[in-house]
């Protein structure tokens, strides 16, 4: 899967069709730490009694992933890259109410293939 985040190509593959890697800049990481918050925890706890999707946590997870991804892209730009390949996400629970979300990949310079 490939897409553009601003002017930076982002893909979970080793390369993106139609592009060739001309320079490897190195590892880039984007991190965010999010608190679930008391209000959302109460609502989510009530929803969990009924079963099904807990929308408050889904929304929080989506926002955290996007922020980690944007920080990774910003770090790639700072290195002079115009693409990030092999993008992955990871997460860790830091405490009962806080999670760390990490986006990481390899910053590269790509050119369109001829």
Swiss-Prot record:
Q: Which InterPro entries match?
A: UPF0145_dom_sf (IPR035439), UPF0145_YbjQ-like (IPR002765)
Coiled-coil regions in this chain? none
Q: Which domain of life is it from?
A: Archaea
Q: Entry's Pfam families? A: YbjQ_1
What family does this chain come from, according to its entry?
Belongs to the UPF0145 family.
Mind telling me what this protein is named? Answer: UPF0145 protein SSO1976
